């Protein structure tokens, strides 16, 4: 019996654990501190800084099963998903890594043992082919002489992409930096399937399938293109779980493995589909994986960046459900089956199941309102189409008005053999982006581009001032040896008490000083293992190697500590009051306020906000000690410590505890005891995205300031109402009741005045061919009273045509009334349209009553004067 996908995943990790590798958990799909990546798309992403030498781990061998998404930017597989055997938006990448430990020999031997040993995957050796980089003789000889693969199944691949080292078998992290040759392992499905070996003209067939890529990072590519050997070569490998599962389960398509068969059956059940070969089932089965795990990792549907990619995937799935005949919301119902089929890899998702389901359901309901109208519009446009290409402007209008991502439009068009002018769509999108950029004035921070090779030791938990040495200086992102007074720069020290922004806590401010210089620090940021002090040299000069005294702004740090500790208390309180589905989705902790984004599907009730406040203040009054302990990550999680959204943790973590009330992983700075916080007050609660709420709160002196401000406002209101704060509510109720009574009396007076005005107006009506015509401009009459006056006049005059107008704040209001017996000859809508056009407006209504507005008050007299002639012509 073949292994299940879950068993294959576990076997891979167990094998490499037996070879001395640290099993490292999958990192978030949202890359930590890497602006170059939209989503995690490879196993090595979380180790990128280790390979670059900017980060160090307490292990030199690692193995992972990394969750990945490829559905935006460079790696965009979305349009092919569901229509090919191996394209997915979400996949798991099995990998083993060596950080300056073993190299080619062991990497190849490990791979061969896992794939062919009877104890592990037991693949037939004669079915395996390998490729190596053309000049990588070392790898070639290991495969041939040590492993024993015949020469005819070892293929050298040269530079096949038009440049030196541009090859399918040469891997590069970027234009510069670590790179090296790779060897790939292929599985031959047999001659009953079309396709040729890698490097042959038929290589795109499905017979030979790549199952493992092993990268040997042995060079550092320089800006001039030269390759320098790395002092400690490393290994990065990747094997798609779905691909190897297909091989081990003896199927040719990833969608036929046990995991997808189970999901496809679940999709059929919730949509009512009966044909299990329908491609839409495959699309939805794939998309629920990416959508559920993206939401669990903190991405919410929106119209920008990662949120927009998520929205595109959800809407594509919903549209395919619509094609299958789904009559109600269905997508969210697949989260449960997904958790079941993922096994141990779905534990994080299971903890957030309710939240993920609610976000998916809300998004589907919102899109369902526009899906039908959008599809109808698309059908109309396609019916009018004379050629085979839908223009980009129409595709953009569908996106802009109905929320149709262009790939969804392309899906519909592809089913009818119609192309989409994607260049035209992109031009319209770029124009919209240009307008948005001009409106926002957003610009990139050059400091984010700094690369620092040195490391800084943070000593700010125990010190607010200490002596350090300048190890690097940067101006405009470039390393310099010295700076002078007036220059803005980033200063890196060997050790520092300054906290660099992390975990939502802002960076410290303060001063770096010496006998002849003073550098004002306005912010502190991390650059790999270095801590950069960002600011301006106020006086003197500063150079690399200088000794400095680093002084943190103590008062500011103290306020930040209170706010950060209060954030932990509030997080725990929210989970008690609202439920354990609450998890942090983002935060900001500075010296003035704390801001906390969390998962919750509705606005908090006032009484819930009060209970959270009371809970936090109760812990403050308990004056609990705030304790920190360093422990293994897994031990901390077992203890129940909550992790911060988006943070990356080492194997040894800092655990912060406040009695039995709160335990979290945190590297930030905190108060010594909860009592130091003094007072906690929530000042606002609002929504930021579907399923995400935001609380802003203040502590200590800031909270006391808000209490005083509230008291001052109450006193001012009490003074205005000639009362005191003790009976203020009664006073306000009394004023409101009196106001309602006066408004009622005023309305009655207005109606009486209108009735009197109507009586006066009736005498001004003239006879036009047996019909009474009344045309008048009224002053001092509210526009909303015109309708009442027309009704009164129609009752008084019998067969009649009435046009009334008034001007308020430069705007013209018009109304026309026609008695029923005259509407066969004169229609109020046509009449009011004729008048409105002359005063720069438009309007309409029923044959017997119509209203309009206009902007040209000066033209009103002439417009009203034209009514008699127009009516006379109609009544002849």
From Swiss-Prot:
The keyword Chaperone does not apply. Zn(2+) binds at residues 564, 568, 666, 670. The keyword Metal-binding applies. Its main location: cytoplasm. GO terms for biological process: alanyl-tRNA aminoacylation; negative regulation of DNA-templated transcription. It is found in: Cytoplasm. Keywords: Acetylation, Aminoacyl-tRNA synthetase, ATP-binding, Cytoplasm, Ligase, Metal-binding, Nucleotide-binding, Protein biosynthesis, RNA-binding, tRNA-binding, Zinc. GO terms for molecular function: alanine-tRNA ligase activity; aminoacyl-tRNA deacylase activity; ATP binding; tRNA binding; zinc ion binding. InterPro entries: aa-tRNA-synth_II/BPL/LPL, Ala-tRNA-lgiase_IIc, Ala-tRNA-ligase_IIc_anticod-bd, Ala-tRNA-synth_IIc_core, Ala-tRNA-synth_IIc_N, Ala-tRNA_ligase, Ala_tRNA_ligase_euk/bac, DHHA1_dom. It is an enzyme of class 6 (ligase). It catalyses: tRNA(Ala) + L-alanine + ATP = L-alanyl-tRNA(Ala) + AMP + diphosphate. GO terms for cellular component: cytosol. Binds 1 zinc ion per subunit. Its cofactor is Zn(2+). The modification N6-acetyllysine is found at residue 74. It holds the Pfam family DHHA1. Its EC number is 6.1.1.7. Disulfide bonds: none annotated. Catalyzes the attachment of alanine to tRNA(Ala) in a two-step reaction: alanine is first activated by ATP to form Ala-AMP and then transferred to the acceptor end of tRNA(Ala). Also edits incorrectly charged Ser-tRNA(Ala) and Gly-tRNA(Ala) via its editing domain. Homotetramer. Consists of three domains; the N-terminal catalytic domain, the editing domain and the C-terminal C-Ala domain. The editing domain removes incorrectly charged amino acids, while the C-Ala domain, along with tRNA(Ala), serves as a bridge to cooperatively bring together the editing and aminoacylation centers thus stimulating deacylation of misacylated tRNAs. Belongs to the class-II aminoacyl-tRNA synthetase family. NCBIfam families: alaS. This is Alanine--tRNA ligase. It comes from Shigella boydii serotype 18 (strain CDC 3083-94 / BS512).
């Amino acid at each position: 019996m073949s292994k299940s996908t879950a068993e294959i995943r576990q076997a891979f990790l167990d094998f490499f654990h037996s070879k001395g590798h640290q099993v490292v958990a999958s990192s978030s799909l949202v890359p930590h501190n890497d602006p170059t990546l939209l989503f995690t798309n490879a196993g090595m992403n979380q180790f990128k800084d280790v390979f670059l030498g900017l980060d160090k781990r307490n292990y030199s061998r690692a193995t992972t099963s990394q969750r990945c998404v490829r559905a935006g930017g460079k790696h965009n597989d979305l349009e092919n998903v569901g229509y090919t055997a191996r394209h997915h938006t979400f996949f798991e990448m099995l990998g083993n890594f060596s950080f300056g430990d073993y190299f080619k020999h062991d990497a190849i031997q490990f791979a061969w043992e896992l794939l062919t040993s009877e104890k592990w995957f037991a693949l037939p050796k004669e079915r395996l082919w390998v490729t190596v980089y053309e000049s990588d003789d070392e790898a070639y000889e290991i495969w041939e002489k040590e492993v024993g693969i015949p020469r005819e199944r070892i293929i050298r691949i040269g530079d096949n992409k038009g440049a030196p080292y541009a090859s399918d078998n040469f891997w590069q992290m970027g234009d510069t930096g670590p790179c090296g040759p790779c060897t790939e392992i292929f599985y031959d499905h047999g001659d009953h399937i079309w396709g040729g070996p890698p490097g042959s003209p038929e290589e795109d067939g499905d017979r030979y399938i790549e199952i493992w890529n092993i990268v040997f990072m042995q060079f550092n590519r320089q800006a001039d293109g030269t390759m320098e050997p790395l002092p400690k070569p490393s290994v990065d490998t990747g094997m798609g779980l779905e691909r190897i599962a297909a091989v081990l389960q003896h199927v040719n398509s990833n969608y036929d493995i046990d995991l997808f068969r189970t999901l496809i059956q679940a999709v059929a059940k919730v949509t009512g589909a009966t044909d299990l070969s329908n491609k839409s089932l495959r699309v939805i089965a794939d998309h629920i994986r990416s959508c559920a795990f993206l939401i669990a990792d903190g991405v919410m549907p929106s119209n920008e960046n990662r949120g927009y990619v998520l929205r595109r995937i959800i809407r594509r799935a919903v549209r395919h459900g619509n094609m299958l005949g789904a009559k109600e919301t269905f997508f969210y119902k697949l989260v449960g089956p997904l958790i079941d089929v993922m096994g141990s890899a779905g534990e994080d998702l299971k903890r957030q199941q309710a939240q993920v389901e609610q976000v998916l359901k809300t998004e589907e309901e919102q899109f369902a309102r526009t899906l039908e109208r959008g599809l109808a519009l698309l059908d109309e446009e396609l019916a009018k189409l004379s050629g085979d290409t839908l223009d980009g402007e129409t595709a953009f209008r569908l996106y802009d008005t109905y929320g149709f991502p262009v790939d969804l439009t392309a899906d519909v068009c592809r089913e009818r053999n119609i192309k989409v002018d994607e260049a035209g769509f992109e031009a319209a999108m770029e124009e919209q982006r240009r307008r948005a950029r001009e409106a926002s004035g957003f610009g990139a921070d050059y400091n984010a581009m700094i690369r620092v090779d040195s490391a800084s030791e943070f000593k700010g938990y125990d010190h607010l001032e200490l002596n350090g040495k300048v190890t690097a200086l940067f101006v405009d992102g470039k390393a310099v040896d010295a700076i002078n007074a007036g220059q803005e720069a980033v200063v890196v020290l060997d050790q520092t008490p300054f906290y660099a922004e992390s975990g939502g806590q802002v960076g410290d401010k303060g001063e770096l000083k010496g006998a002849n210089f003073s550098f004002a620090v306005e912010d502190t940021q991390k650059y790999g293992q270095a801590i950069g002090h960002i600011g301006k040299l106020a006086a003197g000069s500063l150079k690399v190697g200088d000794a400095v005294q680093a002084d943190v702004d103590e008062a500011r740090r103290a306020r930040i500590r209170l706010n950060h500790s209060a954030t932990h208390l509030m997080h725990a309180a929210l989970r008690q009051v609202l439920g354990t589905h609450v998890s942090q989705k983002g935060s900001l902790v500075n010296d003035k306020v704390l801001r906390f984004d969390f998962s919750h599907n509705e606005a908090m009730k006032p009484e819930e906000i009060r209970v959270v406040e009371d809970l936090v203040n109760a812990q403050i009054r308990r004056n609990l000690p705030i304790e920190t302990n360093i422990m293994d990550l897994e031990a901390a999680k077992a203890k129940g410590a909550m992790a911060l959204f988006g943070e990356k943790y080492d194997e040894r973590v800092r655990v912060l505890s406040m009695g039995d009330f709160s335990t979290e992983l945190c590297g930030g700075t905190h108060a010594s005891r909860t009592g130091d916080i003094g007072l906690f007050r929530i000042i606002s609660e609002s929504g930021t995205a579907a399923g995400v709420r935001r609380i802003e709160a203040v502590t200590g002196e800031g909270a006391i300031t808000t209490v005083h401000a509230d008291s001052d406002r109450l006193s001012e209101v009490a003074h205005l109402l000639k009362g005191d704060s003790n009976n203020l509510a009664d006073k306000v109720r009394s004023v409101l009741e009196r106001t309602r009574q006066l408004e009622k009396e005023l309305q009655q007076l207005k109606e009486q005045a209108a009735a009197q005005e109507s009586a006066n107006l009736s005498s001004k009506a003239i006879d036009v061919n047996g019909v009474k015509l009344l045309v008048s401009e009224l002053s001092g009459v509210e526009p909303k009273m015109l309708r009442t006056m027309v009704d009164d006049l129609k009752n008084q005059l019998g067969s009649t045509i009435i046009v009334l107008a008034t001007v308020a704040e430069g705007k013209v209001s018009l109304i026309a009334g026609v008695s029923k017996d005259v509407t066969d000859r004169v229609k109020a809508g046509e009449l009011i349209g004729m008048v409105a056009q002359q005063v720069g407006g438009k309007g309409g209504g029923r044959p017997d009553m119509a209203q309009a507005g206009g902007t040209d008050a000066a033209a009103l007299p002439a417009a009203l004067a034209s009514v008699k002639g127009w009516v006379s012509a109609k009544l002849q």
